[in-house]
Amino acid sequence: MPGGKGKSIGGKAGSKDSAGKAQKSHSAKAGLQFPCGRVKRFLKNNTQNKMRVGAKAAVYVTAVLEYLTAEVLELAGNAAKDLKVKRITPRHLQLAIRGDEELDTLIRATIAFGGVLPRINRALLLKVEQKKKNKTEA
């Protein structure tokens, strides 16, 4: 009597084939390192009116976060390598973010212990060059 009360033949509980398969997380299915479940939980908790969040939306946001993190870490690693050190510091993060035009517009935050970029205003440089030129002519 499939479909009636009592013992049924079909269903997940009766099949022995699915017992051998290991469970895969959403992150593993999408090939990501960041946790999709945690991102989904944050999205659900931080939205107004307790809006529903789809599974694909959480995977997409997780992929974007992972890509941006990898991009920043790669640039910061290059900055650390240029300075011949093996540890990435907030200064390297600052140099990496401010050195890339797109990341600079995206991340407008102040990075603690990041310092400032070495920059001299062009107007000041022109005055110094003119003074040097006047001294050589005189």
Curated annotation (Swiss-Prot):
A single Gene Ontology CC term: nucleus
Compositionally skewed regions (Gly residues) per UniProt: 1-13
Keywords carried by this UniProt record: Acetylation, Chromosome, DNA-binding, Nucleosome core, Nucleus
Alphabetized Gene3D superfamilies for the sequence: Histone, subunit A (1.10.20.10)
Location in or out of the cell: Nucleus; Chromosome
Entry GO MF terms: chromatin DNA binding; identical protein binding; protein heterodimerization activity; RNA polymerase II cis-regulatory region sequence-specific DNA binding; structural constituent of chromatin
Region feature Disordered, mapped onto this chain: 1-32
UniProt modified residues of type N6-acetyllysine: K5, K12
UniProt modification remark: Acetylated once deposited into chromatin.
SMART domains attached to this UniProt entry: H2A
Family: Belongs to the histone H2A family.
Stated name of the protein: Histone H2A.Z
Species assigned in the record: Aspergillus oryzae (strain ATCC 42149 / RIB 40)
